[in-house]
Regions:
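A short, well-structured edge-of-sheet supersecondary motif
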Residues: 1-6, 38, 80, 232, ...
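The feature captures the short pre-catalytic strand/loop hairpin that immediately precedes
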Residues: 2-4, 88-99, 163-178
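Active-site helix/loop module of the DD-peptidase/beta-lactamase fold
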Residues: 9, 14-18, 30-74, 95-97, ...
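Short pre-catalytic strand/loop immediately N-terminal to key active-site residues, enriched for Gly-Thr
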Residues: 9-14, 100-104, 177-179, 243
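Structural recognition of the beta-strand scaffold that forms the well-ordered cores
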Residues: 14, 60-62, 107, 114, ...
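Short alpha-helical patches at coil-to-helix transitions and adjacent helical residues
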Residues: 18-24, 55, 108-113, 190
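Catalytic loop of the DD-peptidase/beta-lactamase superfamily, centered on the K-T-G motif
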Residues: 121-134, 138, 156, 165-291
């Protein structure tokens, strides 16, 4: 806002929780490589997990059925210390119990995807950001995309985040958890998300069978569905399976809605706190000309 720079399709926004679909794909790539199995214990790769979390599986992290508490609840609101993915096991170690027995319930938690970034690093032998670049962004031509690390990487055409304070928009671009990558640390552009969406439809990165599993609601131990797959909320619409996700972090609010049977994908990226891009995406999808 300070420079009145215009947003373009190449402008990079922080994805917040839209990042989770990329983290999930990284895990699936490693499963296809034979470096891990989706039903492995997470502790195989993250041995520093607290004792109460040592029976949690990678699948349960992917589907928010682990019962693990959200690490953000252990971060003091006025903290200026930057939390990283590697700090998450210690943060959840401040507690001593799961919210529910793993696999028996659903509870959306950023903890799972921060831990999955550690799983990716240790299974691949590469930093999480480098793995994303080499296995996802570069092969798909996503030249504006990066899992941003301050002092390590840069964001090519970066939109900074803003919040409305006392009637004025002020820059509120980073919080104490902004350095956590697995749950929300990717910056990308609309141009790059077109490449991503085409790759999903064409099964360029993972097999059709694995993609189908990612787009299927997880099932709890009592047979109930959760409405969440691997990095996507999943529900039914008149046109078939509907995939969606909302992302919100300091200064950014985003939404994605995808209906594969209609070959329809709607993405809204905003560099502001608040607003309701998910509602707008749903209203766009309902337009008569797009049905």
């Amino acid at each position: 806002l300070e420079t009145h720079a215009r947003a373009t399709p190449a402008t990079d926004y922080r994805l917040a929780s839209l990042t989770k679909q990329f983290t999930a794909t990284a895990v699936m790539l490693l499963a296809a490589d034979g470096k891990l199995r989706i039903d492995d214990l997470a502790a195989r790769f993250v041995p520093e997990l607290p004792d109460y979390a040592r029976r949690v599986t990678i699948r349960q992290l992917l589907t928010h059925t682990s019962g693990l508490p959200d690490y953000e609840d252990a971060v003091h609101g006025d903290s200026t210390h930057q939390v990283h993915d590697r700090d998450v096991p210690e943060l959840i170690g401040q507690g001593d119990t799961l919210y529910f027995p793993s696999g028996s319930g659903y509870g959306y938690s950023n903890t799972g995807y921060a831990l999955l970034a550690l799983v990716v690093e240790r299974a691949s032998g590469q930093p999480f950001a480098r793995f994303l670049h080499e296995r996802i962004f570069a092969p798909l031509g996503m030249t504006h995309s990066v899992a941003y690390e301050k002092g390590v990487s840069s964001v090519p055409q970066r939109a900074f985040g803003y919040s409305l304070r006392d009637g004025h928009w002020v820059r509120t671009d980073q919080s104490s958890t902004s350095a956590v990558l697995g749950d929300g640390g990717i910056y990308t552009s609309i141009e790059d998300l077109v490449h991503w969406d085409h790759a999903l439809d064409a099964h360029t990165l993972v097999s059709e069978a694995m993609q189908r599993e990612a787009w299927t609601s997880a099932t709890l131990t009592d047979g109930r569905g959760t409405g969440y797959g691997f990095g996507w909320f999943v529900d039914d619409s008149a046109s078939g399976v509907r995939l969606r996700h909302h992302g919100e972090t300091m200064g950014f609010t985003n939404a994605i809605l995808k209906i594969p049977s209609r070959r329809l994908t709607i993405v809204l990226l905003t560099n502001r706190t608040g607003g309701d891009p998910w509602d707008l995406a749903a209203r766009i999808a309902a337009l008569p000309g797009l049905r």
